[in-house]
């Protein structure tokens, strides 16, 4: 398995990395960073028709958290964005940890992740992978 795209953002407090690879038609993504990269959460996101009936893709996600870990917000954010953009099943795992983070540092981490997510979506398209026809 080759990582289709892998990116890194330097932060004022540390760094964040994210990447994605294909497993058949599905996507495996990861997040890591901070002082103690780890696996704190795994999210599986599955595309489905939006309940609005307007033909857009929505997502249903299942979450596995390690006790005491708060990595769901980041892993879920990346998994659901990739799932919506590609119409593919996405599993994202990883963790980001810095002791005693300040609110502005949390905001910086979220913005970095959003930038990495955009890079991954572009990288998937640039590698020639088009969104799946979901058949909804």
PLM segments and residue spans:
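Conserved mixed alpha/beta catalytic, RNA-binding, or beta-rich assembly cores of soluble enzyme
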Residues: 7-85, 89-98, 103-131
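Ser/Thr/Pro-rich, acidic low-complexity intrinsically disordered regulatory segments
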Residues: 1-2, 11, 134
């Amino acid at each position: 398995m080759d990582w289709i795209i892998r990116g890194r953002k330097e932060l004022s407090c540390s760094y964040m990395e994210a990447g994605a690879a294909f497993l058949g038609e599905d996507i495996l993504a990861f997040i890591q960073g901070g002082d103690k990269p780890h696996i704190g959460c795994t999210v599986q996101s599955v595309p489905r028709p939006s309940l609005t009936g307007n033909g857009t893709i929505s997502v249903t996600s299942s979450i596995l958290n390690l006790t005491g870990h708060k990595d769901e917000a980041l892993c879920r954010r990346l998994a659901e964005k990739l799932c919506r953009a590609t119409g593919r099943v996405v599993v994202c795992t990883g963790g980001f940890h810095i002791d005693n983070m300040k609110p502005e540092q949390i905001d910086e981490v979220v913005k970095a992740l959003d930038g990495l997510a955009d890079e991954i979506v572009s990288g998937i398209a640039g590698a020639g992978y088009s969104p799946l026809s979901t058949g909804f």
